[in-house]
Amino acid sequence: MSMVYMNIMLAFTMSLIGLLMYRSHLMSSLLCLEGMMLSLFVMASLMILSTHFTLASMMPIILLVFAACEAALGLALLVMISNTYGTDYVQNLNLLQC
């Protein structure tokens, strides 16, 4: 396995660990999710280019479209939560609290 693939896997792992550790603020969770999506995009693009599998060449573009939709929804939710509660804590998203 080359160093490029190892670095991309390390970036994905670090983003996943960051998502698991810093899940109290919504902004840090969104940044970690974006890091995970970016590393998945780069990994998918490199895999398709290295195997010359042209039938799946649209997969990274579709992944980027879903990542952009996820980012837009996440930022809209962040703005709504910060305007309503004044903070970006994820615990404010719990609908079961009184």
Curated annotation (Swiss-Prot):
The membrane spanning regions, by residue number, are: 1-21, 29-49, 61-81
Q: Where in the cell is it found?
A: Mitochondrion inner membrane
Q: What is this protein called?
A: NADH-ubiquinone oxidoreductase chain 4L
Q: How does it sit in the membrane?
A: Multi-pass membrane protein
Corresponding gene?
Answer: MT-ND4L
Q: Which reaction does it catalyse?
A: a ubiquinone + NADH + 5 H(+)(in) = a ubiquinol + NAD(+) + 4 H(+)(out)
Record's subunit section: Core subunit of respiratory chain NADH dehydrogenase (Complex I) which is composed of 45 different subunits.
Q: Tell me the function of this protein.
A: Core subunit of the mitochondrial membrane respiratory chain NADH dehydrogenase (Complex I) which catalyzes electron transfer from NADH through the respiratory chain, using ubiquinone as an electron acceptor. Part of the enzyme membrane arm which is embedded in the lipid bilayer and involved in proton translocation.
Report the EC code(s) recorded for this entry: 7.1.1.2
A cellular component term (GO) from this record? respiratory chain complex I
Instruction: Give the record's keywords alphabetically.
Output: Electron transport, Membrane, Mitochondrion, Mitochondrion inner membrane, NAD, Respiratory chain, Translocase, Transmembrane, Transmembrane helix, Transport, Ubiquinone
What's the short name of a Pfam family annotated to this entry? Oxidored_q2
- Provide one Gene Ontology biological process annotation: ATP synthesis coupled electron transport
Question: Any idea which GO molecular function terms this record carries?
Answer: NADH dehydrogenase (ubiquinone) activity
